[in-house]
Amino acid sequence: MTPLSSPLSQYWQTVVERLPEGFTETSLSVQAKSVLTFSDFALDSVIAHPEWLAELESASPQADEWRHYAGWLQEALAGVCDDASLMRELRFFRRRIMVRIAWAQTLSLVDDETILQQLSHLAETLIVGARDWLYAACCREWGTPCNPQGVPQPLLILGMGKLGGGELNFSSDIDLIFAWPEHGETRGGRRELDNAQFFTRLGQRLIKALDQPTMDGFVYRVDMRLRPFGDSGPLVLSFAALEDYYQEQGRDWERYAMVKARLMGDNDDAWSRELRAMLRPFVFRRYIDFSVIQSLRNMKGMIAREVRRRGLKDNIKLGAGGIREIEFIVQVFQLIRGGREPSLQSRSLLPTLDAIAALHLLPENDVAQLRVAYLFLRRLENLLQSINDEQTQTLPADDLNRARLAWGMKAENWPQLVGELTDHMANVRRVFNELIGDDEADTPQEEERSEPWREVWQDALQEDDSTPVLAHLADEDRRQVLTLIADFRKELDKRPIGPRGRQVLDQLMPHLLADVCSREDAAVTLSRITPLLAGIVTRTTYLELLSEFPGALKHLIMLCAASPMIASQLARYPLLLDELLDPGTLYQPTATDAYRDELRQYLLRVPEEDEEQQLEALRQFKQAQLLRIAAADIAGTLPVMKVSDHLTWLAEAMIDAVVQQAWTQMVARYGQPAHLDERQGRGFAVVGYGKLGGWELGYSSDLDLIFLHDCPMDVMTNGEREIDGRQFYLRLAQRIMHLFSTRTSSGILYEVDARLRPSGAAGMLVTSADAFADYQQHEAWTWEHQALVRARVVYGDPQLTSQFDTVRRTIMTTARDGKTLQTEVREMREKMRAHLGNKHRDRFDIKADEGGITDIEFIAQYLVLRYAHEKPKLTRWSDNVRILELLAQNGIMDEHEAQALTVAYTTLRDELHHLALQELPGHVAQTCFSKERALVQASWRKWLVAV
């Protein structure tokens, strides 16, 4: 323990003179000497109650003694017979425990987080103890409040602010909201009361018991102004009244207050759960809510003005970089993202900071500095208040209290403490300004740049009007831009936009127009952005996102200019605008092997039993990942092969999650097939064909899937609703198809085509592995064996995967007559061309026409089926590029031809990706890709036409 500083050692002599009889300087420990010198509150208390000092000297306070508060208070209230004795015992108990906490805090016997916890538990214990005693007393007098069904109704108390967050300071008032569940009347008393009357009287008596000063002091100053309608509203509200208020009139600052709200006492009963469920949507919005930024700025501005008005200097709570700014920083993330990130819904600041770090919402160093600063400031605040049990956050001006604080904070002197404090508050202020900033107007340069565009936006210029800021555009482009602006304004007149929405739009549009019209393709870009804006003008939070984050606006303009597909996706699903905030992730897709893990974490935010939210979350995750892949594609950071790799890995992660969800639902209903009891896995596999099987998915590709199982004929499920095992797998596959195809507000997940299964659409949706093998060996057509070349298991346990791989290898390595195979493959290609060929004779269909992608695929498939019995290694891969490599490595095709076909294939696929980004069909002018087409046609003739 740090020895007392010189000023405090001198002050000790004053303390000695006030010590109670029986206590001498030599009889006191160093710890007692330190605490009594530091805290006048502790000194006054032990003078009034000398036994407390003896108790502290013999048994120091413990970190976990808050667990005993309720039991100790129950003993103290055992003999209470009226309100007066209740008030006396509550005050006595509070003072005794506060002295113990001051002792532990001053001597650093427990850490600062635990001190906050002890202070909060003490308050909750006193509130609940007083409520329960008074509730019983009121019931004896007026009867028990009941609903119409006769069910007793409790008084629920919401602890707000630091009390709710478990972070109460030493000398704090307490913010409470009172509620009761249902209307009704009291029963069993001397007179009947309406429930509203009963709970109002109970609330009034509770406030008096805690708040009214007596000769013993008070327990806590009680502040009820956070309740609906504040001081002018009812003291206690029913659940229905609370719900109506927060749905219809709840204000931003009430959302912030409600973040920390916690029900006092036993809060896991049905009434408590109902109240929490009712309040949660008000506090944590399902969508990303950027209106928080401006609202917190406004609140901070009000506080700053109050600090100036009241001359509050050296205020460690409200000043720049103080406790309130740390709270604001944390609340920004809670209120913007808390609806989608349950880890941000903690009432306490420090766990929420941990969640912010885990979600990478702030740099690690910033989070570390905020944590250290918060604990430093909270310790300083508590020590300051414990000197006189006084509610203050203003640093002292007198030398004695400055010396006390310097010693308590383990600084050598006051200047050193001020220096440390200044550093911490500067760190907080920096993060606060970067995140929230001051509510200041644009800089003069920004104002000068945006002002003429404000005129363009607000003055509704005609097509033939001239304005200097559009002079750089060609006449036709200028007319198009003005027409688009005019049409957009007309469209807005049809939309129910509130005052806040119009205000934000008027702030946003000058900046947007300035950026868009600086581009050569201004008209095209604006034509893609205005439909998006028209779709979000009634959802102000998205406008605020673009207004608050210029970087997001810049990326929006760039991506919409590059791709109408992206513009359409953003317009259809505005939730994706959130992805524009972080260019570090926007242009860096998830690592290919990390999609499953990221999706798993994403789905943890959604209750497993909530199917609707699960479906929505799957679709939102997919759309966000597609946007990131497309952005990287546009930026040139992903080559064509990598684009398809990412799209394929994403699809596999989705399949994994959908099967998991379907399996969970089926097992809950029927149990699992009994043959799985003695083995690992699920006896189920999903096989991907076509582009999925070949690692070649495009942006809008559907999924070609078949489903396999290995369930014996006579197996039943082991659940209460027993069904045949094979019927279980059929229903599982049907459930999977349903989960993929169900249309939610975020669309469908994927189009799934299961027609490549044995016997096609006429066959069973799910097939046993044995039946699949038999079909492939005895009934399948050559084109089905071609399809098998590009097939692989995308979900399945190892046993079934191995079974499928064996069947595939066996079929592909079967010896075939070369001439017959050549004829069958060629005839199938001709049928496809006749059925799917290009209807635009003056255009080249990149996929279907001669010399296109399908020809390359057929060449590869033919050669594998033709030569795999001689070269089994040809069966290793299912994608065309690596098959071409294998053909060269095994001497089937010369290396030059294989390389040339690979280049042609990737070039044509790259073009298809880019056409998809432009929302264009997959055909180009006949003159395009003539070199690649000639090469493919020559290879086709060599392998599939030559005699």
From Swiss-Prot:
Region (Adenylyl transferase): 450-947
Record-linked SUPFAM superfamilies: Nucleotidyltransferase, Nucleotidyltransferase substrate binding subunit/domain
Cofactor(s) for this UniProt protein: Mg(2+)
Residue numbers spanned by region Adenylyl removase: 1-440
Annotated Gene3D superfamilies: 1.20.120.1510, Beta Polymerase, domain 2, Glutamine synthase adenylyltransferase GlnE, Nucleotidyltransferases domain 2
Reactions performed catalytically: [glutamine synthetase]-O(4)-(5'-adenylyl)-L-tyrosine + phosphate = [glutamine synthetase]-L-tyrosine + ADP; [glutamine synthetase]-L-tyrosine + ATP = [glutamine synthetase]-O(4)-(5'-adenylyl)-L-tyrosine + diphosphate
Keyword annotations from UniProtKB, A to Z: ATP-binding, Magnesium, Multifunctional enzyme, Nucleotide-binding, Nucleotidyltransferase, Transferase
EC number: 2.7.7.89, 2.7.7.42
Pfam families according to UniProt: GlnD_UR_UTase, GlnE
Superkingdom of origin organism: Bacteria
InterPro entries: GlnE (IPR023057), GlnE_rpt_dom (IPR005190), NT_sf (IPR043519), PII_UdlTrfase/GS_AdlTrfase (IPR013546)
Gene Ontology cellular-component annotations: cytosol
GO biological process, alphabetically ordered: regulation of glutamine family amino acid metabolic process
GO molecular function: [glutamate-ammonia-ligase] adenylyltransferase activity; [glutamine synthetase]-adenylyl-L-tyrosine phosphorylase activity; ATP binding; magnesium ion binding
Function: Involved in the regulation of glutamine synthetase GlnA, a key enzyme in the process to assimilate ammonia. When cellular nitrogen levels are high, the C-terminal adenylyl transferase (AT) inactivates GlnA by covalent transfer of an adenylyl group from ATP to specific tyrosine residue of GlnA, thus reducing its activity. Conversely, when nitrogen levels are low, the N-terminal adenylyl removase (AR) activates GlnA by removing the adenylyl group by phosphorolysis, increasing its activity.
Family: Belongs to the GlnE family.
PANTHER family in UniProt: BIFUNCTIONAL GLUTAMINE SYNTHETASE ADENYLYLTRANSFERASE_ADENYLYL-REMOVING ENZYME, GLUTAMINE SYNTHETASE ADENYLYLTRANSFERASE
Protein name listed in UniProt: Bifunctional glutamine synthetase adenylyltransferase/adenylyl-removing enzyme
The species this protein was found in: Salmonella gallinarum (strain 287/91 / NCTC 13346)
